Amino acid sequence: MVIRPAGFVVALTVVIAGARAGTQAPQAPSETQMPAAISLPPAFDRVLRDYEAAWRDGDGPRLAALFTEDGFAVQSGSPIRRGRAAIAGGITKPGGSLQLTAYAYSSSGTVGYIIGGYRYPTTVGAGGRFVLALQSGPDGHWLIAADLDNSGPRAR
């Protein structure tokens, strides 16, 4: 079964709403304090570690293979890229030792998400933030349907 982008957004909204139902909102971290890191299930953690490795190596095709065929990459300071070819074309050189940390995740059926932060060893301040919308592929592996990130608050 192929979930179209509109259907995926509806399904992801249901997952997020379900994950939030009946829970109290945690205390918001300060501008420079990041939420506590959490451990992910192995299948979700694999997505983050494979992303880090492909980014570090500047391997656009390998990074793009982590996405659904029509996936989106929406990154600070870059045009929106849709599809594996566009995503692969956006990575042309090694990106450094990217460190991804998960703060929250959820899944239901074939959709899920990871909310987290990113930084490099030399990052000053809080670092950036990301949301990965995930979809389970035909082989059961989780693929990125959308990667949304921003650079986060500026270091003071």
Go through each PLM region and give its residues.
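A short gly/proline-enriched turn/hairpin at secondary-structure junctions
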Residues: 66, 70-81
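Bacterial N-terminal signal peptides
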Residues: 7-17
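Short beta-strand segments enriched in hydrophobic/aromatic residues
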Residues: 67, 118-120, 148-150
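Short beta-strand edge/turn micro-motifs at domain boundaries
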Residues: 26, 127-156
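Surface-exposed, charged secondary-structure patches
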Residues: 86-127
